[in-house]
A protein has these predicted regions:
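Histidine-acidic metal/acid-base catalytic patches
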Residues: 25, 65, 69, 91-105, ...
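The substrate-binding groove and active-site-proximal loops of carbohydrate-active enzymes
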Residues: 1-11, 51-54, 113, 163-169
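Active-site beta-loop-alpha junctions enriched in small/polar residues
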Residues: 1-5, 34-36, 83-85, 110-114, ...
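A near-ubiquitous, low-amplitude feature marking generic local secondary-structure context
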Residues: 43, 47-50, 77-80, 111, ...
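Glycine-centered flexibility sites
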Residues: 75, 85, 110-112, 168-170, ...
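Active-site acidic/histidine proton-transfer and metal-coordination neighborhood
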Residues: 6-106
Length: 226
């Protein structure tokens, strides 16, 4: 909540989790702005999410950089998660955040959220590869995303309708993504995310589908999975 909390307050709020993650030897703490977001509001269209100007995001990035350095000094890298419905949603938002922040702040690169937000997955990956510390492999169903946008529906409507799905079940080329990660010697986590209605998409079946697809594309990219 860095838009509404000052530096000291925000550090106080996240300190317990940061310390816990250090104790657990976690790869990073994933951070996203949870104030001024519409992602949890069923009646608010995702198209109505708050938007900041370039200068406003640069100012925000400076503040986030201080928090990221505070985390780093405690032994925990901080990776920023761009998210639908929030102030950092589309490709411009991500570019401005990265341009305006210090190297203390890394990026949690989420394929599904970026494409849903209208961004270019490969261009963003190639541009900010050296800042990516954590990766979310999430696919989307473009027809559902199109319906959500055109009919002014909410982010939660999108989740329930099945806008997101596991890798290999949507439209994102995860072979190309994996090839780029391998080329940049990425060695962090790849997390599968695909929040959707379990009545329509049985969790075990879809988890298995996503896992098998990731194993296949990573093997072809010579990206080892440990």
């Amino acid at each position: 909540n860095s838009l509404i909390n000052d530096f000291s307050k925000e550090c106080e709020v996240i300190s317990q989790q940061v310390d816990q993650f250090v104790e657990l030897s976690s790869p990073c703490i994933v951070y996203a702005e949870c104030s001024n977001t519409v992602q949890g509001e069923m009646q608010t269209p995702v198209n109505s999410r708050p938007k900041l100007t370039r200068d406003e995001i640069f100012s925000y990035a400076s503040k986030i950089s201080e928090i990221a350095k505070w985390c780093s000094d405690r032994g925990m890298p901080m990776a920023y998660h761009h998210h639908m419905g929030s102030i950092i949603e589309n490709e411009d938002d991500v570019n401005w955040l990265m341009e305006g922040s210090s190297s203390d702040l890394s990026l949690c690169f989420d394929t599904g959220h970026l494409l849903f937000g209208g961004g270019d997955v490969m261009a963003t990956l190639d541009r900010w590869g050296d800042r990516i510390h954590h990766v979310h492999y999430k696919d989307i169903r473009p027809d559902i995303v199109k319906d959500i946008r055109e009919n002014n529906k909410s982010f939660l409507d999108a989740v329930i309708a099945g806008a997101f799905t596991v890798p290999g079940d949507g439209c994102i080329d995860f072979q190309a993504v994996s090839n780029s990660l391998a080329a940049m010697s990425y060695s962090g986590w790849i997390v599968v995310e695909a929040e959707q209605d379990p009545a329509k998409a049985p969790p075990y079946d879809y988890s298995k589908m996503g896992y098998e697809h990731i194993v296949k594309v990573c093997k072809m990219a010579d990206l080892s999975i440990n």
